[in-house]
Design a protein with these regions (language model features):
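Perimembrane loop-to-helix junctions flanking transmembrane segments
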Residues: 67-79
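Membrane-interface loops
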Residues: 61-67
């Protein structure tokens, strides 16, 4: 699952490079909803969320530690391993459902929720282990940035005068 879990790290630079505006006349500019860059971002986000969802359903040890550490550090709760594993089961279903909805429906609000969730889970390293683990959070910022880029690309389509439907 590791290659899929890191799909956004490959998709982010490639998809964003293809999504950026081109100088006039250099290339035919396709609308964002049909661009190759959007598809790369879409597949990268879906792959990452699916892989993380599967790891959560398997009660991956590091994820258990993140839940227990964050609960203790921020709200003073003593979360047991069984409680953390129950939460991971819910989170796993949540992540896989989000990935499926993103691929099947391409709703803008799903990409927005995935962005918030991706940033929150990236920052969970700092919330569980303290500021010294900022580099782990930074390495995972694409988990929220890629869905945010999708949200913004689809939002641009909706706001453009030629657009009549919402992606």
């Amino acid at each position: 699952l590791a290659p899929l879990a890191h799909a956004v790290r490959v998709a982010a630079p490639l998809g964003l490079a293809l999504l950026l505006p081109k100088p006039p006349g250099l290339f035919h500019q396709r609308p964002p909803q049909a661009s190759v860059g959007v598809w790369i971002l879409l597949l990268g986000a879906a792959a990452t969320f699916t892989a993380h969802g599967m790891e959560a359903l398997e009660h991956y040890g590091r994820f258990v530690d993140l839940i227990i550490g964050s609960a203790d550090r921020w709200i003073g709760w003593d979360v047991s391993q069984a409680q953390a594993e129950t939460a991971l089961t819910i989170i796993g279903v949540h992540d896989i459902l989000l990935a499926a909805l993103l691929l099947m429906r391409r709703w803008r609000w799903i990409a927005g929720w995935m962005a918030l969730w991706g940033f929150a889970t990236a920052l969970s390293r700092v919330s569980a282990m303290g500021g010294d683990s900022w580099h782990q959070a930074a390495a995972r910022m694409a988990n929220g940035a890629v869905p945010l880029a999708l949200y913004l690309a689809w939002w641009q389509v909706v706001r453009s005068p030629a657009s009549k439907t919402s992606p």
